[in-house]
Amino acid sequence: MPELPEVEVVRRGLETILKDQPILEKVELMRKDLREPIPAKKISTLVGQPLTSIERRAKYLLLWTPKGAMLSHLGMTGTWRVAVPGDERLHDHIYLHFSGDLRLAYRDPRRFGCFDFVQDPLKHPKLADLGPEPLEAEFNGPLLWEKLRGKDVALKVALMDQKVVVGVGNIYASEALFAAGIKPTLPARKLSLERASLLVGEIKKILSQSIKAGGSSISDFAQASGESGYFQTSFRVYGRDKEPCVTCGQQVKSKVLGGRNTFWCSRCQK
């Protein structure tokens, strides 16, 4: 599933494509639903409006007009691309037609994404209860430490709780914990303030590095330009079960935590 870096890379790509604030001329839905029903009538109220900005909140994209926004979640396999005439593909579910003969296509083979209407982000059920953005200044060691107090779940599971911090999914939780030298199975409530501050620093560093690298292209992820990211070539533990640790040479371990495969080095991470 695309995590924060991948969604931010898509946002930046779309922002470049739509920089001239084109008018939304038509929303063409090839089906009535993705993971959930698409509110076609509400979204149709945005037709005729200029696209004023593209924002990201957690793993959601918000395409803003003066009357509201289209909200997009990429799910497991969703991608946005410019689709010139004749470029219609299997599993294209949404076409956004803009002035200047510009057309964006949303393709999602597994249909785990969503496409929704937003007027007030603070009141929208998908956005209202989200935690802090990890790359913002407000996300710091004391805040993370406070949010983890009393949590008996494994630290890695807690990091993937979108009420604790948004956008840190399976890949980047494993990588950040390795960089900070903290084992993923540590009960979240036992993380010290000092180590929380260290972990926050590594989360920020790794997310920033991945964005710069265009994200991690595993499964179907691609940038809005169609290019792949290449941060996956920098993975130090993720997906490296039974391979030698890049730091100490000990075999990397894996375990399912919170329903997701987790990777770590038992020598380097305590």
UniProtKB/Swiss-Prot annotation:
InterPro entries: DNA_glyclase/AP_lyase_DNA-bd (IPR015886), DNA_glyclase_Znf_dom_DNA_BS (IPR015887), Formamido-pyr_DNA_Glyclase (IPR020629), FPG_cat (IPR012319), MutM-like_N-ter (IPR035937), Ribosomal_uS13-like_H2TH (IPR010979), Znf_DNA_glyclase/AP_lyase (IPR000214), Znf_FPG/IleRS (IPR010663). PROSITE patterns: FPG_CAT, ZF_FPG_1, ZF_FPG_2. Its cofactor is Zn(2+). Its EC number is 3.2.2.23, 4.2.99.18. The active site is at P2, E3, K59, R260. Keywords: DNA damage, DNA repair, DNA-binding, Glycosidase, Hydrolase, Lyase, Metal-binding, Multifunctional enzyme, Zinc, Zinc-finger. It comes from the Bacteria. SUPFAM superfamilies: Glucocorticoid receptor-like (DNA-binding domain), N-terminal domain of MutM-like DNA repair proteins, S13-like H2TH domain. GO terms for molecular function: 8-oxo-7,8-dihydroguanine DNA N-glycosylase activity; class I DNA-(apurinic or apyrimidinic site) endonuclease activity; damaged DNA binding; zinc ion binding. Binds 1 zinc ion per subunit. DNA binds at H91, R110, K151. SMART domains: Fapy_DNA_glyco, H2TH. GO terms for biological process: base-excision repair. It catalyses: Hydrolysis of DNA containing ring-opened 7-methylguanine residues, releasing 2,6-diamino-4-hydroxy-5-(N-methyl)formamidopyrimidine; 2'-deoxyribonucleotide-(2'-deoxyribose 5'-phosphate)-2'-deoxyribonucleotide-DNA = a 3'-end 2'-deoxyribonucleotide-(2,3-dehydro-2,3-deoxyribose 5'-phosphate)-DNA + a 5'-end 5'-phospho-2'-deoxyribonucleoside-DNA + H(+). A zinc finger (FPG-type) spans 236-270. HAMAP family: Fapy_DNA_glycosyl (MF_00103). Monomer. Belongs to the FPG family. Involved in base excision repair of DNA damaged by oxidation or by mutagenic agents. Acts as a DNA glycosylase that recognizes and removes damaged bases. Has a preference for oxidized purines, such as 7,8-dihydro-8-oxoguanine (8-oxoG). Has AP (apurinic/apyrimidinic) lyase activity and introduces nicks in the DNA strand. Cleaves the DNA backbone by beta-delta elimination to generate a single-strand break at the site of the removed base with both 3'- and 5'-phosphates. This is Formamidopyrimidine-DNA glycosylase.
